Amino acid sequence: MFNLIRKSTEWGGKTLILESGKIARQANGAVMVSYAGTTVLATVVTGKTKEPVDFLPLTVQFVAKSYAVGKIPGGFLKREGKPSDRETLISRLIDRSIRPLFPSGFYDEVSIVCNLLSYDTVTPPEVTALIGATAALSISGVSFNGLVAGVRIGYLPSEDKYLLNASADDMLYSSLDLFLSGNEDSVLMVESEASELSESQMLRAVTFGHQNCQEVINLIREFSEEKGVQPIEFIPHDINPIVNYIESSYKQDFSLAYSNTVKKERVLKLEELRDKVLSDFAEKCSVDNVECDNQDVISALKSFERSLVRSQIVETSSRIDGRAFDEIRNIEIEVDVLPKAHGSALFTRGNTQALVVTALGTPQDEQIVDDLDGDRRENFLLHYNFPPYAVGESAALRAPGRREIGHGKLAWRAIRYVLPEKSDFPYTIRVVSEITESDGSSSMATVCGASLALMDTGVPIKSPVAGIAMGLIKEGDKFIILSDILGDEDYLGDMDFKVAGTAEGVTALQMDMKISGISVDVIEKALLQAKDGRMHILSKMNAVIQESRNSIKNHAPRIESIFINKDKIRNVIGSGGKNIRDICEKTGAKIEIIQDGTVMIYAVNNEAVEYAKSMIMDIVTEPEIGKVFEGTVVEIVKFGAFVNFLGGKRGLIHISEIKNEHISAVGSVISVNDKVKVLVIGIDREHVQLSMRRVDQETGEPIDGELYNVRKSSFSDDSSSSGTSSSGSSFKESYSGNRHGSHEKRRSGGSRSSRRNSSGSNYYREDLHSSDFGNNNRSFSNSRNGHEVPRKPRFF
């Protein structure tokens, strides 16, 4: 029933298997690829386009269902929704790798779906998916020029060792994360992030990756030969007569239009000429009474313009806007352009402009990423927006598409390495790039603008980052590398090569080809020329702002962390969250408690942070003999006054310790709610003995001298340590003297915290937020044998 074909090889220490003939047999081509514990089903289906187009309508979709790792999706529907960013990025990797290998003029619809069926969370799924897509194309009968393989490369600088298809654990120690695709002869696509690696280290990684593609390419070739499906020969329409006519009639007009250095004027003139050519051919066909194929005319126009611009660059050694090959456009930079933003920058390079804005948040603002590798929290977000007005188009705003997601991710990779560690800067950072004008290299303008905005914000980045886009004009064996390409040079050229980095090295590299690959020699020259351009841009940036500001803006949120003894966590929380809720209500701050004793305080200003911190420290600080504290009188009794200090702690000022003279009534000196400064002079278990007379009530300083010796016999070291008061009665007896008052009621059973499990282990989760403690959300309500018993949940 099944005509099963199977090929396998050992690659990178793992088994790679290609199978076909059993699953998805209605598709033009279907291949099941297994690499170690990761399995992908790749299918190819083709069809004719419904309307004439002048581009390849290729659609690539990478689909990762949660069942691949044995999970059920979250949410109400328990079903996968729109593609995740990771699915989108992998889809783009595959698309960019195979698109250059379709023949010129091939405009049939091609749909490729790569379904991740099983994932071991170790083997890179993008590698497996690209191999599957290429293998499926090779047996689909679609015209496709060559075979492609992909690899993921890591690098251990301490060992000077490159890693092939390394696991996620191995990549934690890698200074490079590079995905590369190539055919037998050349490199087709590169996507990477690095830790300030040199150009030579990046080039060696590319060479290493391309060499390791060859074994897989040979396997796919053997697999397709055994399948025996021959590709349908594609015969393009002969558009040379149309190209010749356009050249003879419109060459001078197009040359003049392309010489205009103002993009808006250039675009309008080119659109006018294209419309004129189309109407000219429509009229000509009507006169000759022949049928005109609009698609052929559009293709001929594109071919003519491409040849015209490229020949002008090669012959005149001058570019569209008159620059030299390695010349950078004029750069204008401003920072702090938006008064209420936490940081902002306006980066303008020629007719490309990015307004980049930063916003700081608390760790509670981190993005929770639901990923097949496991849920994680991301504290650095970078979003790239490309509105239609940036290129003078009238269109409705839409949700971010694949291009926006891809460009934002590239800028994210370029910036991430220079960010401070979370322990040093615990904020959540969001960077938004609004492209307000575009004439090429908007993603690299985003990188430059993001670096400037972060420094303006006060984020202590390691060093500034700049980015530049390089282009290529290749004619035969000759090639020209262009620095800082325009949009038209990107559209009509052979390569889009983007490099971002600091003065020390490369942090991100992306390469896309429009031809069937380039050699390593071309990549080397592009890297070196890009370095010169990057240094030039960095010098312009440094002239405006060289390093991060010393502090964040006054209107930015404040975050401070303190450490407390883990045994004190339950005291900070209080009964049913009473204490932590009280702190939040009084200060306006948010409190997060982590199991290791770290307390994070988030507030809108420094005053709120300091207030919250002082309240927490009052709770966790233990009174010490000889220390002075400020307290509030809460109760007057005949033998003294009770004072609350250090949060909820209570102590007694005996009547003899109120003033350094005889007083007949306590109420004649102090009253309830008075603020007083007290010295701890005795501690007997939980009872604290305080003194006012030994403290200067104005300065809060202990008073030296004779005052310490008054009634010395009553305050000897022996009596203090045993808890004896100056009146001769014990301190414990002083407390018991108020047996019928509110204090005794509190001692006799009002405090639940005194009866809690001393370990406090049941009192917090891994992370505790102040919002977790509501009046009706107490987790513990019963006590049994001195330990808390969790309340059973109710089910309705």
From Swiss-Prot:
Residue ranges of the region described as Disordered: 714-796
Biased segments, Basic and acidic residues type: 785-796
Low complexity biased stretches: 714-736, 771-784
Domain of life: Bacteria
Binding positions (Mg(2+)): D490, D496
CC annotations in GO: cytosol
E.C. no: 2.7.7.8
Required cofactor names: Mg(2+)
Subcellular location: Cytoplasm
Biased composition regions of type Basic residues, renumbered to the chain: 740-755
Domain KH: 557-616
Biological processes annotated in GO: mRNA catabolic process; RNA processing
InterPro entries in UniProt: ExoRNase_PH_dom1, ExoRNase_PH_dom2, ExoRNase_PH_dom2_sf, KH_dom, KH_dom_type_1, KH_dom_type_1_sf, NA-bd_OB-fold, PNPase
Gene3D superfamilies: GHMP Kinase, N-terminal domain (3.30.230.70), K Homology domain, type 1 (3.30.1370.10), Nucleic acid-binding proteins (2.40.50.140)
Keywords associated with the record: Cytoplasm, Magnesium, Metal-binding, Nucleotidyltransferase, RNA-binding, Transferase
SUPFAM superfamilies in the record: Eukaryotic type KH-domain (KH-domain type I) (SSF54791), Nucleic acid-binding proteins (SSF50249), Polynucleotide phosphorylase/guanosine pentaphosphate synthase (PNPase/GPSI), domain 3 (SSF46915), Ribonuclease PH domain 2-like (SSF55666), Ribosomal protein S5 domain 2-like (SSF54211)
Reactions that this protein is recorded to catalyse: RNA(n+1) + phosphate = RNA(n) + a ribonucleoside 5'-diphosphate
Residue ranges of every copy of the S1 motif domain listed in the record: 626-693
GO molecular function term, any single one: polyribonucleotide nucleotidyltransferase activity
Family to which the UniProt record says this protein belongs: Belongs to the polyribonucleotide nucleotidyltransferase family.
Function: Involved in mRNA degradation. Catalyzes the phosphorolysis of single-stranded polyribonucleotides processively in the 3'- to 5'-direction.
NCBIfam families (UniProt xref): polynuc_phos, PRK11824.1
Protein name (Swiss-Prot/TrEMBL): Polyribonucleotide nucleotidyltransferase
Source organism of this protein record: Ehrlichia canis (strain Jake)
Lineage: Bacteria, Pseudomonadati, Pseudomonadota, Alphaproteobacteria, Rickettsiales
